[in-house]
Amino acid sequence: MKARALEHLFDDFGRSLDGLGEALGVGAEEPLAIDGTIQRFELTFELFWKVVRRLLARQGIEANSPRTVVQQAYRLGWLDDEQRWLKLLEDRNLTSHTYREALAQEIYSRIPAHHAAMREVAQKLSATS
C-alpha cells in the first residue's frame, strides 16, 4: 500500500478513536447512547486491524484476519498483552454478530479499557508508520 493511503487510513483510525472517546463521554443513560458507542467501537476496531495489517505487510508479514493481525502484532511487540487483544476482538465479534441487551451492557462496560488500549497502540504505531 502506498504511504499516502496508509497515512489516510491511520488518520481515519485516529478520528474514529476520537469519536469513540466522545461517545464514551455521553454516558449510558439511554440505550441509543450505548448502541452508538458500541457501533463506534466496532468501526474503530475495524480501522485498527486494517492499519496494523498494512504495517505488517510493510514488514513482509501477511495477515489476512483480525486474529492473525493481533497475533503477529503481539509477536513484534506492538501489542503488550495478546490475551487482552484477543478479548477485545471477541467483544467486537460478539457485538457485530448478535444483539442482546445484557451482552451489550457487559461489552459497553469494557469499551473504556478497549479505547485506552487502542489509543496506546495508536501512539506506539504512529512512531513506526
Residue locations for each model-derived region?
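Solvent-exposed interaction patches of small proteins and small membrane subunits
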Residues: M1-S129
